[in-house]
Amino acid sequence: MPELPEVETIVRGLDRELRGETIDSLEIFRSDPIIQGDPESFSEFLCGRKIKAVQRRAKFLLFHFEPVGGMVVHLRMTGKFTLTETKEPPGPHERIWFQLKSGRLLIYSDLRCFGTLECHESLDAWEDSKKLGPEPFSQDFNAKSLRKRLRESHREVKPLLLDQGLLAGLGNIYASEVLFRCGINPCRKGKRVKLKELEKLVDETRSVLNEAIEKNGTSISDFRRVDEKTGEFQNFLRVYEREGKPCVLSLIHI
């Protein structure tokens, strides 16, 4: 599943390409991803909408429309967007076509159909946003507030970092990388992690995520950018999926 750096990479690509575009029409080949309303009302809502911006919240893509309204997309395992100048017969995993007034085509594809799309007259009405924890780059994510939350739990530190209600955007890849850089055992109880260690964890979280965003995310299996290119951060992973390989610090096999 795309994590924060992958979603941020996609969002930046879409925002750059789609800002100011207008959705002219839709073709829906499979309606499973539409989780609010029926395909007809989904299409009716979107047709004629001008895209003001594309932003990210946690692992979600937020399409903002002018003057109001928005669409929330969760790519989950295999969802992706691509842009094309030409219209060819739909591929086997293409689920929705968004025809743009410029003549370009925005394609939503999803091999496993776990991704979701939902529209709202106001993104303030998006209920899932209220369940999300702070963004890693926000001031609300800090060692003291994190310690308070960890002390309330009996869980291990890694599952806590994966909890989207505690911290938005992290997944297995980046939680593993952050804990490795901090020297914190992922099986350690969260409430046993000291304040000084949490200060380092906050810093390393931001550092790892920034590095991954600069490398356009991690492409291990399905992740592709809007231009279909892969990310590069998989070449810089220090611990994730490196079992049996020498540790980058000690040369002992992981």
Annotate each language-model stretch with its function.
Residues 3-6, 10, 19, 38, ...:
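Alpha-helical structural motif
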Residues 1, 251-254:
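Accessible peptide chain termini
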Residues 1-117, 241:
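Gly/Gly-Pro- and Ser/Thr-rich, intrinsically disordered tail segments characteristic of DNA damage-repair
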Residues 71-169, 174-181, 189, 243:
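Phosphate/anion-contacting hairpin/loop surfaces
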Residues 20, 48, 131-134, 183:
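Glycine-centered secondary-structure boundary/capping sites
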Residues 22-42, 55, 60, 147-252:
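Basic, nucleic-acid-binding surfaces and adjacent catalytic neighborhoods in DNA/RNA-processing proteins
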